[in-house]
Amino acid sequence: MLLAVTLVACGESRAANEGNGRIADVSVTPGSDHARAVPRDSSVLSLARAAGGVDGRHYTVSAQATSGFIVGKIGGGEPRDTSIAPTHDLSACRPFTQSLVPSRDGGVGNSVVWLVGVATGPRDDAPRRVRVMLDGCRLEPRVQRVAAGGTVMITSRDAMMTRLQFLEVGGASASRGTASRGTASRGTVLLNDAGQVVPTSDAAKVAGLVQIRDDLHPWIRAYLVVTPHPFVAVTAADGEFRFDTVPPGSYTLVIWHERFGTRQQRVRVDAHVETRVDMRY
C-alpha cells in the first residue's frame, strides 16, 4: 500500500503563513501510520459507528468556526469487466457485461470512502430518497449513498420473480449471501412484474454498508452506503473524492471496494488547510 499525504494551506499566501509560524506545504512520509489492509469485517463495520459518542452513532449538526478539507484519490487494482450469462428467466435476463471496477486516469471507481470519529459538523448532504432499478436482470446503480433514516425505492422493469435481500456487509449473512436466524438482515423485497415500485425504509434505518442481492438470481447485486455523517463518498471512475468543512482533528479514513476489500489510514485535519490523501489498493 502506497500513501502520499500533502497538506496545503487554503486561501493564504506562503509568506503570510510563514509569518504566522505555519507551514504552507508539508509532505508526510509513510511510516508506522501509513495506510494498511485491515480485516474486511471490522473495517466495514466501522461505517456504522463512524460518528461520535461512546457507541459512535451520535452526530450533531453545528456551524464550525474553523474547518479544513480532505482531497484524495483512490488508485491501483485492475479495471475489470465481468461477463454475466444468466441461466434462467431468459425472457428478461440476457447475457451482459458489467464493469465492477470502473477506471479512468488510474482511478478506482465505486470505492466507498469515509471518516471515522466525526462527532459534529455540517448537515449531511446524502439524498434521503434514492432509487434502485432492476432492469435487464441487473441492479443499477451498483453503489450509491443514502442518508440514515432515508427511503429506498425499488423499481422493476423485469417481468420475473425476484426476492431481494438487504444484508449488512460484514455480517455472516452477507458473506454467505443468505439471510438466516440471528444474522444482520435489513429486510426483503419481493418483485414479480414489470412496473412495480416498492419503497423500503428498513434498509436505510441506520448507518452501515448494505448489500442488495437476489436469492433467485445470484448475479444480481448492488450496495447501499447508509451515511452516518456528511464525510462519506462514493468515487467515480477517476477515483477522486473531496470532504469540505471537516472539523479540525485526527480521524481514521477508511476505503472499501467490493473486489479489493478495505484499507485505512490515520489523517490529521488542521484549520484552513487542505489535506491531500492518495491511496492505492
Region spans (language model):
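Extracytoplasmic copper-binding redox domains, predominantly the cupredoxin/blue-copper superfamily
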Residues: C10-Y281
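Bacterial N-terminal signal peptides
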Residues: M1-V8
